[in-house]
């Protein structure tokens, strides 16, 4: 039944628009939280000012989301915010700065060690989101923000957006605590970086440990773990599809 509702509502443009708006708003607010935390801890006044300016731009895009009349506009605000966010991403790296310099997000292939970390850990999050969609009866391939493509888990990609900043924080922790180092990577011609097999196993362990950490869910008003959040959000999404909730309520990181 829930998949029938999902398929039907994925064809309703107004419903898709509201879902996409909520998803992106949640992601951008969580990105803002990451940068706000960095700004509070930064001792470099120039960097702190750059971060505050980036936060201001993201906050402006959050407010513009409310007036967006198309999914394309929402994607535009998300894309602009992502560019702003990643423009100050390097300031969040305190240790091993030279070895883990970050200039911009590159995916296929990852052209820095930090990009390789992000891509690998995002892929673990994607797999978790596919699993929780299936667990609550949703079709992970029928999305609302992301268009459907053959073999693309569009709904899982939708669901993971608000959790990407959690991965970003984990990456900063691993680098700044020197739990990941240059020796964990292979560099190929063209400045293409890959994580070696043994280090991938260690990263999976770090990811699983992060998932065990307790966190408070403000809307549900319960204590949870980081790993349970995608499942809880998938259930909220299912309730939205059934009509129990008027809008999808993303997880906002306090």
Curated annotation (Swiss-Prot):
Q: Which NCBIfam families match?
A: cas1
Q: What does this protein do?
A: CRISPR (clustered regularly interspaced short palindromic repeat), is an adaptive immune system that provides protection against mobile genetic elements (viruses, transposable elements and conjugative plasmids). CRISPR clusters contain spacers, sequences complementary to antecedent mobile elements, and target invading nucleic acids. CRISPR clusters are transcribed and processed into CRISPR RNA (crRNA). Acts as a dsDNA endonuclease. Involved in the integration of spacer DNA into the CRISPR cassette.
Cite the record's note on assembly.
Answer: Homodimer, forms a heterotetramer with a Cas2 homodimer.
Extract the InterPro entries matched here: Cas1, CRISPR-assoc_Cas1, CRISPR-assoc_Cas1_C
Instruction: Detail which positions bind Mn(2+).
Output: 78, 146, 161
**Protein name as catalogued:** CRISPR-associated endonuclease Cas1
Q: Which domain of life is it from?
A: Bacteria
Question: Which gene carries the instructions for this protein?
Answer: cas1
Identify one Pfam family in the record.
Answer: Cas_Cas1
């Amino acid at each position: 039944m829930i998949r029938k509702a999902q398929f039907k509502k994925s064809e309703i443009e107004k419903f898709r628009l509201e879902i996409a708006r909520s998803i992106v708003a949640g992601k951008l607010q969580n990105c803002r939280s990451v940068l706000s935390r960095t700004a509070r801890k930064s001792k470099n006044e120039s960097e702190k000012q750059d971060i505050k300016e980036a936060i201001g731009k993201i906050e402006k895009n959050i407010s513009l989301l409310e007036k967006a009349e198309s999914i394309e506009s929402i994607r535009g605000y998300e894309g602009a915010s992502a560019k702003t966010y990643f423009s100050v991403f390097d300031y969040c790296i305190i240790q091993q700065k030279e070895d883990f310099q970050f200039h911009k997000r590159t995916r296929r292939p990852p052209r820095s060690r930090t990009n390789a970390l992000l891509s690998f850990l995002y892929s673990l999050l994607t797999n978790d989101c596919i699993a929780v969609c299936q667990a609550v009866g949703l079709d992970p391939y029928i999305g609302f923000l992301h268009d459907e493509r053959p073999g693309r888990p569009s709904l899982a990609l939708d669901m993971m957006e608000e959790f990407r900043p959690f991965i970003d924080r984990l990456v900063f922790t691993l680098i700044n605590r020197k739990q990941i180092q240059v020796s964990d990577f292979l560099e190929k011609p063209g400045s293409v970086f890959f994580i070696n097999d043994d280090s991938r196993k260690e990263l999976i362990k770090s990811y699983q440990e992060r998932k065990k950490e307790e966190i408070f869910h403000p809307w549900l008003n319960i204590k949870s773990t980081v790993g349970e959040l995608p499942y809880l959000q998938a259930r909220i999404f299912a309730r939205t599809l059934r009509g129990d909730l008027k809008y999808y309520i993303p997880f906002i990181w306090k």
